[in-house]
Amino acid sequence: VSDRLVDRVGKLLAQAEGTDNEHEAAAFVERAQQLATEHAVDLELARARQRDRQHRGGGEPLVQERLAVGQRGQRGNRHRVLLYTVVAAVNDVMVNVSHDSSYVLGFGHRSDLEVVERLWSSLAVQMAAAAQRRMDKGEHRAAGVTGLSWRLSFYDGFIDAVSTRLQRAREVAIEQRQPSEVAGEPSTALVLREKSERVQSFYDTASDARGSWRGAWSGRTRSSRTARESGRTDGARADLGQPGVRRRGQLPA
């Protein structure tokens, strides 16, 4: 991925984190995802044009990268993993999860992996900050559940809303891309489908995963509907202008 793209995405996320206006924050995050999708489309079209001269996939190889999401045994890890899979899904990255949910393995083009990590790290901070703000107001006590149960339920709702928002941003970017006038050039849908198939093929070859991830609900016995709704509300607003958002990588258990 070009440093310019990563810098543009990073600047948009920094703007989101630096504003107290929830609508501006949401717009910055959605624009970051749109830029990532537009870049992916343009890159795939360039690869398609060169298919008679180069191996499919162009000069950017498919890679596998490891990303630590938290210390072993930290309860919030499963939601950090779930958030990563949500961001990865809209950026053509496949994911394996460690048995203890302390790290993930991303499979895809390096450009996509870089964008996924940028978006994930920003949204993880957003999620933790938004939950803490509400807990500071006593919402977990009003719901009649423990702080941990409330927080994890909040994360459920938050991630659900973020997933919807990022998918919408991807769809908007694809719809807004003007069709090329070059005769014989493949459609956006076609190149993205071929890219997805290429990543899947690489994953099938490179992955040595066994079994399946148990998900964010593993080991939980209680949840809070009001907390989930609060999470959906904050996830839809993407309110990144809260205290503590600069502490990247911090997600309370």
Language-model features and meaning:
Residues V1-L67:
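Long alpha-helical, hydrophobic tracts
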Residues T37-A253:
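Long, charge-patterned amphipathic interaction tracts in eukaryotic proteins
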